[in-house]
Design a protein with these regions (language model features):
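Internal glycine-rich alpha/beta core junctions
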Residues: 98-101, 105-109, 113, 175-297
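A helix-coil-helix interface module used to build multimeric assemblies
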Residues: 2-4, 10-182, 188-191
Length: 297
């Protein structure tokens, strides 16, 4: 929506094909709008946007900014949109505009009140953080499961002697348990990094509006509570503009991928040396040399 989050309660416009659109400008139709639209890629934050919309509407009603009857109609429309799915949304510049258009289609002009006291700036930032929290927790859970498996295997091989390598050459004797525990330690640090990123992601930007807040008597702590955030992002400009949490999450995942790459490469080397026998489920063969077992996976 426009940066002015407080002036969108007018009746929606109709385009040349009588399709409800939230706003009209030089990008309202044609190839420019199609090129600029992120609606398809926004499917990843469809559920997040609906959650943010619901929390915002509930807060607006609790604060007396919109009526309970209007809030109920909007929430019912959001439920219907949720059931219909992302693929049923009308065309839009992004999922946020498309959902608002769909609400207005169902509710009428009052549906636009859903966006009262809110900018697309803080809305988008909140949706991204909401979805990223799920992704980070899922990634952290996989690291915990991997670390547990490594430690269980290490405990079974505390006295299983193996050659330790440097420069791909046998260097010193060690044990399989010692080797596996080294990766368990690295994975543990990966988990900690992901959880640190989660902590900095888990703050609500909602209510920051375009970048300087809103004169409406909103309750930012209430929407943060409804969305499961630990706290709000204090500075409204930082709330709308910050994206460092994305870089931090990406870095944590990249470091974990490096840990996994090292473990996978070790297994490839051990397979070549005949120390381990990879399952056929994780191997391929050659089109001309069927005796080969290639560790491609």
């Amino acid at each position: 929506m426009d940066a002015d989050a407080n002036s969108n309660n007018d009746e929606p416009n109709e385009d040349a094909d009588s399709e409800t659109v939230v706003r009209r400008d030089r990008f309202s139709g044609g190839p420019a709008r199609e090129f600029l639209s992120s609606l398809t890629g926004d499917s990843r934050i469809f559920a997040a946007d609906l959650a943010v919309d619901r929390a915002h509407v509930v807060m607006l009603a609790e604060q007396g900014i919109i009526g309970d009857d209007v809030a109920g109609e909007i929430l019912a429309a959001l439920d219907a949109i949720d059931s219909a799915g992302h693929s049923d949304l009308p065309d839009g510049e992004d999922v946020h505009e498309a959902i608002e258009s769909a609400v207005i289609d169902r509710v009428g002009p009052d549906g636009g009140k859903m966006h009262t006291a809110r900018s697309r700036n803080d809305e988008v930032a909140t949706c991204i953080r909401y979805r990223l929290r799920e992704d980070l927790l899922e990634a952290a859970e996989t690291t915990l499961a991997l670390r547990e498996s490594l430690l269980e295997a290490a405990a079974e091989h505390t006295e299983t002697v193996m050659a330790g390598y440097t420069h791909l050459q046998p260097a010193q004797p060690t044990t399989v348990g010692h080797y596996l525990a080294s990766y368990a330690a690295a994975v543990g640090r990966d988990t900690a990094r992901l959880l640190d990123a989660y902590d900095r992601t888990n703050a609500s930007p909602l209510g920051g509006a375009a970048f300087a807040g809103t004169p409406f008597d909103i309750d930012r702590e209430r929407t943060a509570e409804l969305l499961g955030f630990d706290r709000v992002v204090d500075n409204a400009m930082d709330a709308a503009s910050a994206r460092d949490f994305l870089a931090e999450a990406t870095a944590g995942l990249a470091i974990h991928a490096t840990t996994l790459s090292g473990l996978a490469e070790d297994i490839v080397v051990f397979a070549n040396k005949g120390y381990v026998d990879l399952s056929d489920d994780y191997s391929s063969t050659s089109s001309i040399m069927p005796q080969k077992k290639n560790p491609d996976t």
